[in-house]
Amino acid sequence: MARYVFITGGVVSSLGKGLASAALGALLQARGFSVRLRKLDPYLNVDPGTMSPFEHGEVFVTDDGAETDLDLGHYERFTGVSARKTDSVSSGRIYSNVLEKERRGDYLGKTIQVIPHVTNEIKDFLRVGEDEVDFMLCEIGGTVGDIEGLPFFEAIRQFAQDKPRGQCIFVHLTLLPYVSASHELKTKPTQHSVKELRSIGIAPDVLLLRSEHPIPEKEREKIALFCNVRKEAVIAAYDLKTIYEAPLAYHREGLDQAVLDAFGISPAPKPNLDRWVDVMDRLEHAEGEVRVAIVGKYTQLEDAYKSIAEALTHGGMANRTRVRAEWINAELFEREDPSPFLEGFHAILVPGGFGERGTEGKIRAAQYAREKGIPYLGICLGMQMAVIEAARNLAHVKDAGSEEFDHEIGRKRYTPVVYHLKEWIQGNHIVERKHDDDKGGTMRLGAYTAALAAGSRVATIYGSTEIEERHRHRYEVDVRYREALEGCGLTFSGMSPDGRLPEIVEIKDHPWFVGVQFHPELKSKPFAPHPLFADFIRAAVEVSRLV
């Protein structure tokens, strides 16, 4: 039976609960325990799949096709444990489940209420898989006091009451603001946050104090006294140069020991933190630097491409090279010649996205990389833009475009070399889709197998002719243009097992030019960099040596 750690936040949002949860999971693993991490989001969307990247940031996709919060990416990167659909839930999903049960008559005519029906649904979610691991770490999104989060806080309060004593603990992350005029840290916001938490029946066992400045011992003692927490369980959470320092930093501060003490686990197994020491060594002792241009649509918010940024860092680790990623709005290239902006970069990456805005700029970036011999990695829409560029400029399909862009305005302007995907094989059945289907949850989502051409660049990179990668798309390159494009040098080196869906394109007579329909960044980890990103950065290093 799993022990439960509930991670909550107070004072302000975006303090780093997800990273704290991921780091704690990594530390418990380092002591020999098995872990699973979960995220409970209070928003009323069923999932983040239809939310704007500017609202939510990246949508992280799991192997089984769940569209989830980017924190699940942190969980996977830090622990290596693949997330599942059952590791993410929102208020919208909970209420949807409750209302479906009411319509079916599952409640036998009872009046449906937040307590007990909504809270019971949340508790049922928490119980799934509790016999599989030693520790279940559950992060509650938002901050204590948010009206949307109240059912979740009530549910975890009840859940802890239902379990035997010592099976659940609460870790609360707050902010210690620094007042520069008086040169002091203020503890009152933390005290009020804990007071708010205690008022709804939850007493924190461990406090994490986010601070930019050193926390004096007397302030820790004061917080321990007023918040009724052991002084050893008052843990500093300082700002760090890199998120990958978090496991070592939290271990130095005693987080993992405080958690094990709260559970009464003694003597605690000693941690083996060698993998994290190696990660930091590779980051701190990089032997060079490469510049990578990310030509995207949502560049104002880097969280929109969080996994890509981290995967590039991992690729740098694999080559002991520092990666300086620079974000360029693709719309700029629709007005300007990309050459002055892209000169000096050692590689170009065009990530995924939706809609026509910025796509002509991405096409011009792909053309620049192809013509100048600059390493290019196109992901999802980035692959489609590379194909459209090749169709226009090499295969002489002058009006080549995507069916997505015509569908947006309701009239035909392009010859669609990229079309709306109407059916595909998933497991043992065929999935069918129409243009007027609901937007949410209707894309080709999750892990799918691809067959790679023997002798191709990607087969060499992967060391295999069969791979499995995660997808999130509803448009696909039309395989009917394969012959024309391959005749111009663009090889379809990866296909779905049935040969109908192009998964990878590459240019052989180019230092490094690869487009992939899937999202390799979602499977990259600091201690296991994704092979595509590792080789992409290797190619960038080669270019940097020629400059």
UniProtKB/Swiss-Prot annotation:
<dbReference type="InterPro" id="IPR017456">
    <property type="entry name" value="CTP_synthase_N"/>
</dbReference>
<feature type="binding site">
    <location>
        <position position="71"/>
    </location>
    <ligand>
        <name>Mg(2+)</name>
    </ligand>
</feature>
<comment type="similarity">
    <text>Belongs to the CTP synthase family.</text>
</comment>
<feature type="domain" description="Glutamine amidotransferase type-1">
    <location>
        <begin position="291"/>
        <end position="546"/>
    </location>
</feature>
<comment type="subunit">
    <text>Homotetramer.</text>
</comment>
<dbReference type="InterPro" id="IPR027417">
    <property type="entry name" value="P-loop_NTPase"/>
</dbReference>
<dbReference type="GO" id="GO:0005524">
    <property type="term" value="F:ATP binding"/>
</dbReference>
<keyword id="KW-0067">ATP-binding</keyword>
<feature type="binding site">
    <location>
        <position position="71"/>
    </location>
    <ligand>
        <name>ATP</name>
    </ligand>
</feature>
<feature type="binding site">
    <location>
        <position position="222"/>
    </location>
    <ligand>
        <name>UTP</name>
    </ligand>
</feature>
<feature type="binding site">
    <location>
        <position position="353"/>
    </location>
    <ligand>
        <name>L-glutamine</name>
    </ligand>
</feature>
<keyword id="KW-0547">Nucleotide-binding</keyword>
<dbReference type="InterPro" id="IPR033828">
    <property type="entry name" value="GATase1_CTP_Synthase"/>
</dbReference>
<dbReference type="InterPro" id="IPR017926">
    <property type="entry name" value="GATASE"/>
</dbReference>
<comment type="function">
    <text>Catalyzes the ATP-dependent amination of UTP to CTP with either L-glutamine or ammonia as the source of nitrogen. Regulates intracellular CTP levels through interactions with the four ribonucleotide triphosphates.</text>
</comment>
<dbReference type="GO" id="GO:0042802">
    <property type="term" value="F:identical protein binding"/>
</dbReference>
<dbReference type="InterPro" id="IPR004468">
    <property type="entry name" value="CTP_synthase"/>
</dbReference>
<feature type="binding site">
    <location>
        <position position="13"/>
    </location>
    <ligand>
        <name>UTP</name>
    </ligand>
</feature>
<keyword id="KW-0665">Pyrimidine biosynthesis</keyword>
<feature type="region of interest" description="Amidoligase domain">
    <location>
        <begin position="1"/>
        <end position="265"/>
    </location>
</feature>
<dbReference type="GO" id="GO:0005829">
    <property type="term" value="C:cytosol"/>
</dbReference>
<feature type="active site">
    <location>
        <position position="519"/>
    </location>
</feature>
<dbReference type="GO" id="GO:0003883">
    <property type="term" value="F:CTP synthase activity"/>
</dbReference>
<feature type="binding site">
    <location>
        <position position="474"/>
    </location>
    <ligand>
        <name>L-glutamine</name>
    </ligand>
</feature>
<feature type="active site" description="Nucleophile; for glutamine hydrolysis">
    <location>
        <position position="380"/>
    </location>
</feature>
<keyword id="KW-0436">Ligase</keyword>
<feature type="binding site">
    <location>
        <position position="404"/>
    </location>
    <ligand>
        <name>L-glutamine</name>
    </ligand>
</feature>
<feature type="binding site">
    <location>
        <begin position="14"/>
        <end position="19"/>
    </location>
    <ligand>
        <name>ATP</name>
    </ligand>
</feature>
<feature type="binding site">
    <location>
        <position position="13"/>
    </location>
    <ligand>
        <name>CTP</name>
    </ligand>
</feature>
<dbReference type="Pfam" id="PF06418">
    <property type="entry name" value="CTP_synth_N"/>
</dbReference>
<dbReference type="GO" id="GO:0044210">
    <property type="term" value="P:'de novo' CTP biosynthetic process"/>
</dbReference>
<dbReference type="GO" id="GO:0004359">
    <property type="term" value="F:glutaminase activity"/>
</dbReference>
<dbReference type="GO" id="GO:0046872">
    <property type="term" value="F:metal ion binding"/>
</dbReference>
<feature type="binding site">
    <location>
        <begin position="186"/>
        <end position="191"/>
    </location>
    <ligand>
        <name>CTP</name>
    </ligand>
</feature>
<keyword id="KW-0479">Metal-binding</keyword>
<dbReference type="GO" id="GO:0019856">
    <property type="term" value="P:pyrimidine nucleobase biosynthetic process"/>
</dbReference>
<feature type="binding site">
    <location>
        <begin position="146"/>
        <end position="148"/>
    </location>
    <ligand>
        <name>CTP</name>
    </ligand>
</feature>
<dbReference type="Pfam" id="PF00117">
    <property type="entry name" value="GATase"/>
</dbReference>
<keyword id="KW-0315">Glutamine amidotransferase</keyword>
<dbReference type="InterPro" id="IPR029062">
    <property type="entry name" value="Class_I_gatase-like"/>
</dbReference>
<feature type="active site">
    <location>
        <position position="521"/>
    </location>
</feature>
<feature type="binding site">
    <location>
        <begin position="381"/>
        <end position="384"/>
    </location>
    <ligand>
        <name>L-glutamine</name>
    </ligand>
</feature>
